């Protein structure tokens, strides 16, 4: 099949029409990874790139947003003490991923506070707050706010989580940060619930996320 591949290179937009061409070779010869956002494309199966909105303007995400029923990809993130944290550390538990752009925004901060309150009464469930904020910011916020029922984690070092779960914003004012989303992983290690919040400035649906672990 034919695939349009769009790459944002500085201020130019390059549109490539794939007719069984070796696009990987084209990328290596003509495109620097440091000067563009590269959208991964599966040439065997159609890959649908998810989108969200920021203040009403469409924002593309890199990769494919994680789907219900799939085995949750493992990931490595950074804790407030700068040590590594992996999903496999939580085997046998329900896991709620509260994913957001930055704690420096009111909506993101509110989501952490609310999940912290809700997390206090959940059995066999761990809530993770994930963003690109530095661990120092996570530590400062959680200490100041008295956050005890949420584990704050940063994706600043490894940057494998954002691609595996399809939540990195590819364009717009917040390009490079994580989109607002909630993902629930069941005790069996499979994705039980997802919400890609359609508008970055809005809060997620907390009740539906909690219902997925009860």
Set out the residue ranges of the language-model regions:
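Short, contiguous, well-ordered secondary-structure segments
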Residues: 1-4, 188-190
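N-terminal targeting signals for export/organelle localization
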Residues: 2-7, 13, 17-18, 22, ...
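Chalcogenol-based redox active-site neighborhoods
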Residues: 48-214
């Amino acid at each position: 099949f034919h695939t349009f591949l769009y790459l944002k290179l500085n201020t130019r937009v390059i549109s490539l029409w794939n007719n069984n061409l070796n696009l990987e070779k084209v990328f290596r010869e003509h495109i620097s990874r440091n000067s563009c956002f590269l959208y991964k494309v599966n040439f065997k199966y159609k890959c649908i790139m998810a989108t969200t909105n920021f203040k009403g303007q469409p924002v593309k995400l890199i990769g494919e947003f994680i789907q219900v029923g799939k085995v949750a990809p493992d990931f490595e993130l950074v804790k407030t003490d700068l040590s590594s944290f992996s999903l496999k550390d939580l085997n046998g538990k329900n896991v709620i991923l509260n994913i957001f752009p930055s704690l420096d925004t009111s909506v993101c901060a509110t989501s952490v506070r609310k999940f912290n309150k809700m997390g206090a009464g959940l059995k066999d469930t761990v809530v993770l707050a994930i963003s690109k904020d530095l661990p120092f910011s996570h530590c400062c916020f959680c200490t100041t706010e008295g956050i005890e029922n949420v584990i704050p984690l940063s994706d600043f070092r490894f940057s494998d989580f954002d691609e595996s779960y399809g939540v990195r914003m590819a364009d717009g004012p917040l390009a490079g940060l994580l989109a607002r989303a909630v993902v629930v992983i069941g005790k069996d290690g499979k994705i039980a619930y997802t919400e890609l919040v359609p508008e970055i400035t809005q809060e997620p649906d907390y009740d539906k996320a909690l219902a997925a672990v009860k």
